[in-house]
C-alpha cells in the first residue's frame, strides 16, 4: 500500500493554535504531512513569507512526519501534485468556511481528480480563533497568549526589540 501524504496549505499569517490543532490531528492520519505556506493576495500580510515558514518550523519541531514547504507563486493543488500528495487537508470553523472550502475543493478536483480533500472540524474552543483576529489584537497591543504557539510570541518579541534598538 502506498504512503498517505497530506498537504495542509494556508497563509498562516500568523499561525494560530487553531491551525496547530488541525496539524496535530492530521499528522496522526498521514505517513507524511506537508504544511504549505502560501501568499494570499486577498489578505494583507503581517509576517513575510520567510518569517512565517521559520515560525511554523519552530512550532512543529516535535513532529517528525511534518515538513514545511512554500510555493508562493503557484496553486496548492500544483504543489500537491509535485509532492505526490494523496489528500488535501482543510480546517472548518463555521458554515462560511465550509462554503469557501467546498468551492476550492471543486476546482482542485477539476485540476487533479486523484487528490482527495479531508475536512477537519475545529474543536469548539478553537472555532473563534483566526489569524485576522490575532492580527487585530496585536495591532492594539492586546495579549495573544493561548491563541498562538510560543514561536509567534517569540517572533513578535524579537521584532519589538529590534524596533526599540533603532
Swiss-Prot record:
UniProt: ATP binding residues: 11-12, 19, 91-93, 101, 126-132
Kindly list any coiled-coil regions of this protein. Answer: none
Q: Name one GO cellular component term.
A: cytoplasm
First-tier enzyme category under EC:
transferase
State the EC number(s). Answer: 2.7.7.3
Site keyed Transition state stabilizer: positions:
19
Q: Where does substrate bind?
A: 11, 43, 76, 90
Superkingdom, natural source: Bacteria
Q: How does it assemble?
A: Homohexamer.
**Name of the protein described by the UniProt record:** Phosphopantetheine adenylyltransferase
Name the gene behind this protein: coaD
